[in-house]
UniProtKB/Swiss-Prot annotation:
CDD domains: RPI_A. Its EC number is 5.3.1.6. The active site is at E103. GO terms for biological process: D-ribose metabolic process; pentose-phosphate shunt, non-oxidative branch. Belongs to the ribose 5-phosphate isomerase family. The keyword Isomerase applies. Transmembrane segments: none annotated. It comes from the Bacteria. GO terms for molecular function: ribose-5-phosphate isomerase activity. Keywords: Isomerase. The lineage of its organism: Bacteria, Pseudomonadati, Pseudomonadota, Gammaproteobacteria, Alteromonadales. This is Ribose-5-phosphate isomerase A. It comes from Shewanella woodyi (strain ATCC 51908 / MS32).
Length: 218
């Protein structure tokens, strides 16, 4: 089974968590694209979706899935999204696709977070994948200096502007032993919009695509 086939298996497995006549929160990325393909097969049975990125919005519109603005929606039963890394406590690093802020907002609204990954994303300790931090452009140098004080090596992700008009600093060499605390610490830095640690709001269900099929962890 290739990595993409494992992603596809996890994406399609998430369909069973989608309730009829509901509005579904949809994340961003290669694994989520498989979920969107799956969601399109039951678009007549759901009201529609709320998207965490312009890319996912476009894909859903192309497939005929109605997309709602989050401000017009009071509740979401589920949010389905991938992760760049996830540990045994369901803490994640996300934001490789630079959509972390909108992902975190939609996840906060949803009753249940369903994380879909292939088995290469499971780790014991978070931090080998660089931690993305979304930053107001004028604060880039200041935020970078503060991140160095926290033990990281921030690198400006050149050529990338987020859907919110901001920039990304990728923080390398962080051994993240207390994700909840670090998430809060970084978010307190003036100029930070948010960071890619999803620990204070982690996943509720993890669907892992593997050579042996999809494993469910709760």
């Amino acid at each position: 089974m290739t990595q993409d086939e494992m992603k596809k298996a996890a994406g399609w497995a998430a369909l069973e968590y989608v309730e009829k006549d509901s509005i579904v929160g949809v994340g961003t990325g290669s694994t989520v694209n498989h979920f969107i393909d799956a969601l399109a097969t039951m678009k007549a049975e759901i009201e529609g979706a709320v998207s965490s990125s312009e890319a996912s919005t476009q894909k859903m519109k192309d497939l005929g899935i109605p997309v709602f603005d989050l401000n017009s929606v009071d509740e979401l039963s589920v949010y389905v999204d991938g992760a760049d890394e996830i540990n045994a406590h369901m803490d994640m690093i996300k934001g490789g696709g630079a959509a972390l802020t909108r992902e975190k907002i939609v996840a906060a609204v949803a009753d249940k977070f369903i994380c879909i990954v292939d088995n290469t994303k499971q780790v014991d300790v978070l931090g080998e994948f660089p931690l993305p931090v979304e930053v107001i452009p004028m604060a880039r140098s200041y935020v970078a200096r503060q991140l160095v004080k926290l033990g990281g090596d921030p690198v400006y992700r050149e050529g990338v502007i987020t859907d919110n008009g901001n920039i990304i600093l990728d923080v390398y060499n962080m051994k993240i032993v207390n994700p909840k605390e670090l998430e809060q610490q970084i978010n307190k830095i003036v100029g930070v919009v948010t960071n890619g640690l999803f620990a204070n709001r982690g996943a509720d269900v993890l669907l892992v695509g593997s050579p042996d099929g999809v494993k469910t962890l709760k």
